[in-house]
Amino acid sequence: MASSMLSTATVASINRVSPAQATMVAPFTGLKSTPVFPTTRKTNSDITSITSNGGKVQCMKVWPTLGMKKFETLSYLPPLTREQLASEVEYLLRSGWIPCLEFELEHGLVYREHARVPGYYDGRYWTMWKLPMFGCTDAAQVLKELDELIKHHPDGYARIIGFDNVRQVQCISFLAYKPPGA
């Protein structure tokens, strides 16, 4: 008896037309063969309108793998001018970091000295030039110390480091001087 009453209630609810059924989407009937977009295509010779980067790839170069050593963060750029060095040092000082100069007389890049795998000391640590410049507020002071370093070691590499004494990490490091012929 209960099952017959349930089925009668179900049939009654199906036969009723509700507002929700009036707004239902038509069922999917398959893909239509009529084109939605126009079939004519405008030829455009402008390379920027092409969606693929095929034309742009021809403009790219592969960096030579032999004879081109990479030193620090900005080493893919041409050597920095005096004004560009001053600008980088000013950024370092504005960020609240402490400038520090380091130099290396033999190798200006990370190298593997003791094994085939990179070790802890293999070319990553350079000799510090004097002490970190605590309290330095002017980029000219840092560049003056850089000039003094270059005068003492003209055949060495020099880099400028920005050290954050709160987090106790090195935040910026870039090559400031390469010896002639390097």
UniProtKB/Swiss-Prot annotation:
Give a yes or no for keyword Chloroplast in this entry.
yes
GO CC annotations, alphabetized: chloroplast
Name of the protein this chain belongs to: Ribulose bisphosphate carboxylase small subunit, chloroplastic
InterPro entries according to UniProt? RuBisCO_ssu, RuBisCO_ssu_dom, RuBisCO_ssu_N, RuBisCO_ssu_sf
Query: Keywords in UniProt for this one?
Result: Calvin cycle, Carbon dioxide fixation, Chloroplast, Photorespiration, Photosynthesis, Plastid, Transit peptide
Misc. remarks from the entry: The basic functional RuBisCO is composed of a large chain homodimer in a 'head-to-tail' conformation. In form I RuBisCO this homodimer is arranged in a barrel-like tetramer with the small subunits forming a tetrameric 'cap' on each end of the 'barrel'.
| Subunit structure and binding partners | Heterohexadecamer of 8 large and 8 small subunits.
Q: SMART domains in the record, alphabetically?
A: RuBisCO_small (SM00961)
Transit peptide start and end: 1-58
Compartments, as annotated in UniProt: Plastid, Chloroplast
Family annotation (PANTHER family): RIBULOSE BISPHOSPHATE CARBOXYLASE SMALL CHAIN 1, CHLOROPLASTIC (PTHR31262), RIBULOSE BISPHOSPHATE CARBOXYLASE SMALL SUBUNIT, CHLOROPLASTIC 2 (PTHR31262:SF19)
Q: What does this protein do?
A: RuBisCO catalyzes two reactions: the carboxylation of D-ribulose 1,5-bisphosphate, the primary event in carbon dioxide fixation, as well as the oxidative fragmentation of the pentose substrate. Both reactions occur simultaneously and in competition at the same active site. Although the small subunit is not catalytic it is essential for maximal activity.
Q: What family is it from?
A: Belongs to the RuBisCO small chain family.
Record flagged with keyword Transit peptide: yes
What single Pfam family name could you report for this chain, choosing any that match?
RbcS
Q: Which GO molecular function annotation, any one, does this entry have?
A: ribulose-bisphosphate carboxylase activity
A GO biological process this protein is involved in?
reductive pentose-phosphate cycle
Q: What domain of life is recorded for the organism?
A: Eukaryota
